[in-house]
């Protein structure tokens, strides 16, 4: 499958959305819901969503691979957010106006500091060479994940910079009905965005690992193509999510020909997530580390995921939930 678009900005919904004054099922303590109407959005139509590649929206945290210190590095998402005074002004403005775009930001003074190594996301809007905050008042960006990072320990667990590899979950190249966990050179993932999923991410919707033996992987965006999708109509998509085995996913992301990404989340359709039994957990999974350790001058840490998976290389499991590593 060819490389698809990367997530460098907030994705719009495929439908026009409306806000309802009901408690959110997605965010605790949020007193409103954002629901899809039956009208396709102008952005979706302009991007020719009818001819886009539909893929599974995977529930994790967004990451990015690009160079740092002269080699490919994994980067964690870090949005630059307004300081207390600016946030107060922004929220007051939103109550009196309809569009966040009319608000005037001072990017030098209105935002909390970020590490020097922080970089803004690629596709965000810029004015006079400076990044413009999105409709939430945030500037999406990235920070490199250093080896042994405590703040980003789960990110760090899926990469090894000495070996230059990442632990990746995707379809088996010879059998789309089988998942594969493999060690992939970071150089092959350059300029891609991926989703970090696992035990300690977003409440672990896929039931991976355990507190005693946490388990995490990177999944490239667009890795799981959705086939046999119904027509782009609200009720047809609703029925597909509710009734089809393939519909037991968080949502759909359409990768459009112009690089635009369009999404729909189960919550947009008033449906629940997470689910007790996900489509991702309905497929067998095989371990293919394919590492010739004789080619390296260093060895894996005994506790690392790479070492643990090397011990069960070539084994096959009925589903992801069944993988339990020795501690």
From Swiss-Prot:
Cofactor needs: Mg(2+); Mn(2+)
What broad class of enzyme is this? ligase
InterPro entries listed in its UniProt record? RLIG1
Q: How is it modified after translation?
A: AMPylates itself (auto-AMPylation).
Family matches, as Pfam families? RLIG1 (PF17720)
What does the record give as the function of this protein?
Answer: Functions as an RNA ligase, in vitro. The ligation reaction entails three nucleotidyl transfer steps. In the first step, the RNA ligase reacts with ATP in the absence of nucleic acid to form a covalent ligase-AMP intermediate and release pyrophosphate. In step 2, the ligase-AMP binds to the nucleic acid and transfers the adenylate to the 5'-PO4 terminus to form an adenylylated intermediate. In step 3, the RNA ligase directs the attack of the 3'-OH on the 5'-phosphoanhydride linkage, resulting in a repaired 3'-5' phosphodiester and release of AMP.
The record's section on PANTHER family has: CHROMOSOME 28 C12ORF29 HOMOLOG, RNA LIGASE 1
Write down what this protein is called: RNA ligase 1
């Amino acid at each position: 499958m060819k490389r698809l678009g990367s997530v460098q900005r907030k994705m719009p919904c495929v439908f026009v959305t409306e806000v309802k004054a009901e408690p959110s099922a997605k965010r605790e303590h949020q007193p409103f819901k954002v629901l899809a109407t039956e009208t396709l959005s102008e952005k979706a139509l302009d991007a020719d969503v009818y001819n886009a590649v539909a893929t599974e929206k995977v529930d994790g945290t967004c990451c990015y691979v690009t160079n740092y210190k002269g080699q490919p590095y994994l980067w964690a998402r870090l949005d630059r957010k307004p300081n207390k005074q600016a946030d107060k002004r922004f929220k007051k403005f939103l109550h009196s106006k309809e569009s966040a775009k009319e608000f005037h930001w001072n990017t030098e003074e209105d935002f909390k500091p970020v590490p020097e190594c922080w970089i803004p996301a690629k596709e965000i809007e810029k004015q006079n060479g400076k990044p413009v905050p999105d409709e939430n008042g945030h500037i999406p960006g990235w920070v490199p994940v250093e080896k042994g990072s405590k703040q980003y320990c789960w990110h760090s667990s899926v990469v090894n910079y000495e070996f230059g590899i990442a632990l990746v979950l995707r379809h088996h190249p010879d059998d789309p009905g089988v998942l594969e966990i493999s060690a992939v050179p970071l150089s092959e993932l350059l300029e891609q965005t991926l989703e970090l999923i696992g035990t300690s991410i977003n409440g672990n919707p896929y039931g991976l690992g355990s507190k005693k033996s946490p388990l995490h992987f990177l999944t490239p965006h667009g890795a799981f193509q959705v086939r046999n999708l119904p027509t782009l109509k609200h009720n047809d998509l609703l029925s597909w999510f509710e009734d089809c085995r393939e519909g037991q996913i968080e949502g759909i992301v359409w990768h459009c020909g112009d690089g635009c990404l369009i999404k729909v989340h189960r919550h947009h359709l008033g449906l629940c997530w997470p689910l007790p039994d996900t489509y991702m957990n309905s497929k067998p999974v095989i371990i293919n580390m394919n590492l010739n350790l004789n080619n390296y001058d260093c060895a894996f840490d005994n506790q690392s995921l790479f070492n643990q998976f090397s011990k069960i290389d070539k084994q096959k499991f009925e589903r992801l939930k069944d993988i339990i590593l020795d501690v």
